[in-house]
Amino acid sequence: MKCLKAAYIREEIQIPDKVKVSLENNVLKVKGPKGEVIKDFSYAKGIRIQLNEGKIILETTFADRRKKALLYSIIAHIKNMITGTINGYRYYLKVISTHFPISVKVSGDEVQVSNLIGEKNIRRAKILPGVKVTVKGEDIVVEGSDIYNVAQTAANIESSTKIVGYDRRIFSDGIYIYKKEVIGLEQSD
């Protein structure tokens, strides 16, 4: 069966009052109370992005499966940008040490992990721009307005403590992501 193309697809995203949005050469800037997120959509060939009367309008013509998927992915990115600038995103990580006490500290634009399974060298994880990392005992909190930078920073911290050559069932030492949330939309447990 042949896949039919949609002749015309138009989707609108309402811009909240707290948010300022600007568009220039397919570079979308969303600014809100929690910060500013900039994303370049110039890779999206065949998809037109416009600002009109408090709405972001996305249009495409003769959309096949790939173009539709790209359109709705861009919509999800824009909604994440708006949510991030209004509320922000937060990731929680836990320091697990069974054999040697792990020491974690933030230094400039990196997180330094020392004494992981007794290693003398310091493992480093890069903190991406616009992300704040705080260490409180065995808990690490990563927060910011850009979900992609927050998630990548948390992943950098987690992967910097990956142990190779040991049985993971016994040597469970490391730093692990255990919770993700939108700030202000916390759920009571």
From Swiss-Prot:
Q: Does the keyword Hydrolase apply?
A: no
Q: Which PROSITE patterns match?
A: RIBOSOMAL_L6_2
Q: Which GO terms describe its cellular component?
A: cytosolic large ribosomal subunit
Pfam families linked: Ribosomal_L6
Cross-referenced SUPFAM superfamilies: Ribosomal protein L6
Q: Which UniProt keywords apply?
A: Ribonucleoprotein, Ribosomal protein, RNA-binding, rRNA-binding
User: What is a GO molecular function of this protein?
Assistant: structural constituent of ribosome
Into which family does the record put it?
Answer: Belongs to the universal ribosomal protein uL6 family.
How does it associate, per the subunit comment?
Part of the 50S ribosomal subunit.
User: In UniProt terms, what function does this protein have?
Assistant: This protein binds to the 23S rRNA, and is important in its secondary structure. It is located near the subunit interface in the base of the L7/L12 stalk, and near the tRNA binding site of the peptidyltransferase center.
Q: What is this protein called?
A: Large ribosomal subunit protein uL6
User: What is the organism lineage in this UniProt record?
Assistant: Archaea, Thermoproteota, Thermoprotei, Sulfolobales, Sulfolobaceae
UniProt gene name: rpl6
